[in-house]
Amino acid sequence: MKIGAMNDPRRDPVAEIEWFGQHGFDFVDLTLDPPAMDPSNVDVKSVRAALARYSLGVVAHAAWYIPISSPFPSLRQAALQEFQRALKVAAHVGAQGMTVHYFRIPPLFPPERYVEWHVEGLRPLCSQAGDLGLTILLENAPGLPGQIDHIAHILEAIPSLGFHLDSGHTHVEGGVGLFDVYVERFGRRLMHVHLSENDGSYDQHLPLNSMPVGQIDWPARIRRLKASGYDGTISLEVFSPDRAYLLQSRDLLRQWWAAA
């Protein structure tokens, strides 16, 4: 298992990478968002050099708000083009995978449209990623009841698509127990994990184990994840301005994983 963290897209990416390298992380979850990480303006050479300097791995994360499943065909095409730009950067910095978010559309359409429009964009993107030696990963979104079935159909339609499980999003979507349901259903396709804490009301990106007793049993959750056979990359999405909380979460995760 490898532990990483996500850069703040408002900050200089090289400085972010250096901080993660200096504090003992295994990889960087490189988010490709404006303002500082717009794919059209990334200094790929500097990013690669910083990663190499600290022997850090990298996974890429496209902007979560790109509307891959918009009801408007022109927006879906524009979304695909944005993902393709991000994919090129991901390949150039040495990423093995790039995350794309499941995207909300207005509840005016039948469920098959959710699946159809995602597949329309993800299928060619996965093909292009394969040519570059990368895998596209689909991440569950926060607070979208029913998406688990849509994601199942999308994964079935695109065998080369991987799954990215965000624990905070599952808590907002359906409570504490939904994380285990996702692991059970998609464990064979699971290629990346995000961990963070919240109180179930929204995606707060709090430090692990920061909620009162009776919320998430983190040692048990990590045991179930490890028992599923997963042994890959885990990003800590702890977005406190005081990064001591990120380091504390990292140390807790190492402790729980070793004990699992």
Question: Model-found features: residue ranges?
Answer:
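Histidine-acidic metal/acid-base catalytic patches
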Residues: 2, 9-21, 148-165, 170-260
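Short glycine-centered, acidic/aromatic-flanked micro-motifs in structured strand/loop junctions
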Residues: 7, 32-34, 102, 138-140, ...
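Active-site acidic/histidine proton-transfer and metal-coordination neighborhood
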Residues: 11-14, 50-53, 69-162, 172, ...
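Conserved beta-strand positions in the central sheet of alpha/beta enzyme cores
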Residues: 29, 59-60, 99, 137, ...
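A short, flexible beta-alpha/helix-coil linker loop
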Residues: 33-35, 65-67, 104-108, 170, ...
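Short, solvent-exposed loop/turn segments at secondary-structure boundaries
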Residues: 39-42, 70-75, 109-114, 174-177, ...
